[in-house]
Amino acid sequence: MRISISNIAWDINEDEKIRDLLQEFHIGAIDIVPGKYFPKPEETTDNEIYKVKDWWSKNGIEIVGMQALLFKKNEMNIFGTKKSRSMMLEYLKRICHIGNILGAKRIVFGSPKNRDRTGLNDLETENIAIDFFNCLGDIANEENVVICLEPCPAYYGCNFMNTSFETAKIVTKILHPSIKMQLDSGAICVNAEDVFEILSKYSNLIGHIHLSEPNLVPLGDGNTNHNNIFNALAKYLPNSLVSVEMLATQNEPHLTSIRRALLVANKIYNSESLP
């Protein structure tokens, strides 16, 4: 399997050191948080986007995905007003454009605060979501990217698409070629889900895979059963791209925690790449 890691784990002023670490591990892919490089996406020029892409590319590293799309955009809510939905679609249109130029085809939609269905019944929730994500799917299709809906457990305060099964149900009903789901090992652990059951039923819906722990601690520091995740992926989605997702550590240098996480990822998911 091919390993990637999200830059949610480090600060962009550490990019050169991270580049060296990734080269040491023979890792040639990263996911990014777009806001780290482009704090105002609507004002970002194509040249600025190409500059980021080219820097990583010349170092042998491909940007393959994006996450945390709506960080600090709490005024936007799928289940808010029509104006709120319209604002969100316009903003995400720009995010998809950035993804297209970067080559980051896998756009992960997590954003639990931006999918708050409070006050709506199941039917209302479903109808609004299907309509919204079909519109977003059309935007993604125009930009040659895929939106991957992320399960977010109730444990994190989310109240829509909490489980992998709920997410798969929504993706199935949306029925748009540019809307997939994300497989998330941390969510599987929190929800005590059976990854073999998920993949036996829904492997065709998976657009991206995050390797994570509950609370996004460094890989291996939580209780996710990564051997089980690997075995299921090897059976149903061999040769997958799998991306390490962990928060930047507060009590340990980022390079130290990232090195530990990559050792775990490579040992289980890609032993041939160990330095």
What kind of feature is each model-predicted range?
Residues 27, 61, 145:
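Short phosphate-binding/catalytic loops that engage adenosine nucleotides
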Residues 41-45, 77-83, 119-124, 158-162, ...:
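Short, solvent-exposed loop/turn segments at secondary-structure boundaries
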Residues 1-4, 11-26, 57, 89, ...:
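Histidine-acidic metal/acid-base catalytic patches
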Residues 9-11, 34-36, 69-72, 113-115, ...:
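Active-site-proximal loop/turn and secondary-structure-junction residues that shape catalytic pockets
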Residues 16, 58, 75-180, 190:
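Active-site acidic/histidine proton-transfer and metal-coordination neighborhood
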